[in-house]
Regions:
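Gly/Ser-rich oxyanion-binding loop with an adjacent helix/lid
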Residues: 1-22, 28-32, 37-41, 76-79, ...
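Glycine-rich phosphate-binding loop
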Residues: 339
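Short Gly/aromatic-enriched secondary-structure transition segments
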Residues: 39-46, 224-225
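FabD-like malonyl-/acyl-CoA
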Residues: 128, 342-346
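Short, charge-rich binding segments
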Residues: 44-46, 54-57, 103
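A structural signal for short, well-ordered beta-strand segments
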Residues: 111-113, 208-210, 343
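C-terminal nucleotide
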Residues: 1-27, 52-85, 182-331, 346-386
Length: 386
């Protein structure tokens, strides 16, 4: 993101004066999919694409916002009980209200912002926007007294209370806590986390966006969550002495005990979740050892599980995964909820050009459009630029 680009738009729209510039990143998740609501681990990292915003207090009770990308301007009062209608502005409004709840005395300000997080790629542009403004308001009006975790929760509460999205905490967490050259293992239950080195010399990390999103009948995500909860319920009934909140608390042996009772579909879904828990821990060991071949192997295993057991893949994503295998890509898998979106690929630099060319050619020949190529580098989280 270009600082001068954002600054020039800010100056143009707000009296020719400059303010402070802040940035927050989007994110990837290397491994640990559909584990958050099962009490497991996720493995995100902040990336070199995000949101950049310039802010300056304006001495009033009015917040004036300009979206550079949308060329849209919205203003609202700090204490407006309803907030703006524009969906993009509600993220800023929500963060303002949540930071006020945390004791930050937010006053009126002018802001212009832009982003280079590709929309529809599952890289959490909304979390980047929330994190950017939470960080900025904490700096401008809160004397930086609000903790990073409270900023994460303010972003999550913004989604819940003002934008109608019942999200977890991974996206905001990655945007706020991101660290250059490191991925983070986050325990979704305890919120404990640990940094792991991710410096794959000789490799590139690239997303291939299938540019499809399949709308399925019913509630596919709720169905899978219900499957997992059903398995836990059956295991808990067999082991009344234990404490079983989620599949995180269950063993392979206990899953096998209830296989006949829960049915094949629920069994397969629970089998994936337990396997994913083990894969995340294996990736932790591999990263500490600098063993990226094992990391890649586990990525392929996750894709296989998401496709065949959890059944959240689609023809296009499986096709991209097959192309990765054919081209000797070290690791490839679905990233995100599934039914469309991206694959995330760990590929050796010497194979990169041939892989991308082959993926574009074959995907275009089969589906009539090229996948979008998104190169990413693991980068720092929310920060003040100047």
């Amino acid at each position: 993101m270009d600082i001068e680009f954002v600054r020039s738009r800010f100056i143009k729209h707000f009296d020719g004066k400059t303010g402070n510039i802040y940035a927050s990143p989007g994110r990837i998740n290397l491994i640990g999919e559909h584990t958050d609501y099962n009490g497991g681990f996720v493995f995100p990292g902040a990336v070199d694409k995000g949101i950049m915003a310039e802010l300056r207090p304006n001495g009033t009770n009015t917040i004036m916002c300009y979206s550079i990308d949308l060329k849209d301007r919205v203003e609202f009062k700090v204490d407006d009980p309803k907030g703006p209608r524009a969906s993009w502005a509600r993220y800023i409004y929500g963060v303002v209200q949540e930071m006020r709840k945390l004791g930050v005395d937010v006053k009126g300000f002018n802001t212009a912002f832009a982003g280079d997080v590709p929309l529809g790629a599952g890289m959490s542009s909304s979390a980047a926007l929330e994190s950017c403004f939470a960080f900025a308001l904490n700096d401008l009006f809160g004397d930086n007294k609000v903790s990073k975790w409270d900023m994460v929760l303010a972003g999550q509460a913004t989604e819940h209370n003002y934008c109608g999205v019942n999200c977890g905490i991974m996206d905001q967490f990655a945007s706020v806590f991101g660290k250059e050259g490191c991925l983070m293992r986050l325990d979704c239950r305890s919120r404990e986390f640990e940094y792991f080195p991710f410096k794959p010399v000789g490799y590139k990390l690239v997303l291939l966006n299938s540019c499809v999103k399949h709308e399925l009948a019913g509630s596919p995500y709720n169905d899978r969550r219900n499957s997992c909860e059903n398995v836990v319920k059956h295991i808990a009934a067999k082991h009344p002495e234990g404490k079983f909140e989620t599949l995180r608390d269950c063993t392979w042996e206990q899953l096998e005990e209830v296989k006949a009772e829960v049915g094949e579909e629920d069994y397969k879904r629970a089998h994936f979740v337990l396997g994913e828990k083990d894969r995340v821990l294996a990736v932790c060991e591999a990263l500490n050892a600098g063993d990226y071949e094992t990391v890649g192997k586990k990525m392929y295993e996750t894709h296989e599980g998401l496709s065949k057991e959890y059944e959240v893949s689609c023809e296009e994503l499986d096709f991209l995964n097959d192309i990765a295998k054919e081209n000797g890509v070290t690791g490839s898998r679905i990233m995100g909820g599934g039914f469309g979106g991206c694959t995330i690929n760990l590929v050796k630099e010497e194979l990169y050009d041939a892989f991308i060319a082959d993926a574009k050619a074959k995907y275009s020949a089969k589906y009539g459009k090229e996948p979008k190529v998104i190169d990413v580098v693991i980068s720092d989280g929310s920060r003040k630029i100047c």
